[in-house]
Amino acid sequence: LKLKDDFGKEYLLTIEQDDFAEDPRNWDNTSTIWTWTKSYKIGDDHDLSDSMWDALADLCVKNNILTWEEMEEKDLFENRLGLALQESEDIAFRWISAYEHSGITISTAVGTYPYNDRWDSGIIGFAFVTKEQYEERCGKRDDWKKEAIKIIDSEVKTVDRWLCGECYRYVLEEKVHYRNEKRCPHCNE
């Protein structure tokens, strides 16, 4: 792409796929993404020896949503713990689904195709933002949870683009003109 600035200087802008893009979870993120996959490392570091149920239960206890006794008494499964987290006033929570077929793509849109495909997709983890995390990074808001959900969706989408190889880099070079020269500037002929 050839560009010209206000002073007539010409530039060449080259945009190309970045095959060595950095994992976006190494950036400054607001949400926490935890996944359990055998073939991929997706999201933030966490103890993979814990099951998804253990991680959800810990999150419920740490955020005063449920006690260990309540969880054992009600014999709650992952989906019930996720529902308790979604209904909480102090945490924004989203499931993460993956579709794996000649590559992988992830989304928080769990109920839509292809993320609800019965053979090649399934829940691989979850993302969350606590009210405390949100207020620390974004300030106090009455609609903090709605905004935190948007942040989760956006950060998961960014990770998905990285997984799918949709990362680009650019190089901006000043165009060099050789005027009125009788010799080649490279070989001097």
Describe each model-derived feature in a short phrase.
Residues 1-189:
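Acidic interaction surfaces
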